[in-house]
C-alpha cells in the first residue's frame, strides 16, 4: 500500500514492507526518505501496519511548538537517523528503511513528548 504525504515541501511515497513488535520496514521514495518515513510514523501513521495511528496524537505544529528544543535536535540535527536501523537503495531509486519503533517510542516517552501506553 502506498501512502503519500507532504513534508518539508516534498511529496513522500511510503510503501509498507513488514513490521513486528519493535520495527517497521518501508520503502520510501522522496528527496529525504529517512525523514519522510519517520515523519509518517510520528504524525500520520502507516495503514495496514501495527502503527496505523500516529505515534504522536497531537498536531505536528502544536507538538513542535510545545517541544522546540527536542524537535530542533531531532529534525535539524538529524537525530531521527539514530532510529534508522538500516537504509539501503533499491534498484528503482527508492530506499528500503528499517525503523526501530520501540527505541523511537521509548525516546519520545523519556522526553515527555508522549506518555507510556498512549495515555
What are these regions (language model features)?
Residues 5-119:
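Domain-level marker for long, solvent-exposed, non-transmembrane regions
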Amino acid at each position: 500500500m502506498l501512502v503519500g504525504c507532504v513534508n518539508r515541501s516534498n511529496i513522500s511515497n511510503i510503501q509498507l514492507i513488514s513490521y513486528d513488535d519493535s520495527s517497521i520496514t518501508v520503502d520510501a521514495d522522496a528527496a529525504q526518505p529517512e525523514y519522510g518515513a519517520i515523519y509518517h510514523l510520528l504524525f500520520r501513521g502507516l495503514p495496514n501496519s501495527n502503527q496505523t495511528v500516529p505515534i504522536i496524537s497531537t498536531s505536528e505544529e502544536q507538538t513542535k511548538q510545545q517541544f522546540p528544543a527536542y524537535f530542533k535536535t531531532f529534525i535539524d540535527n538529524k537525530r531521527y537517523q539514530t532510529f534508522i536501523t538500516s537504509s539501503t537503495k533499491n534498484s528503482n531509486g527508492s530506499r528500503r528503511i528499517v525503523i526501530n519503533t520501540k527505541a523511537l517510542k521509548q525516546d519520545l516517552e523519556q522526553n515527555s513528548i508522549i506518555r507510556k501506553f498512549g495515555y
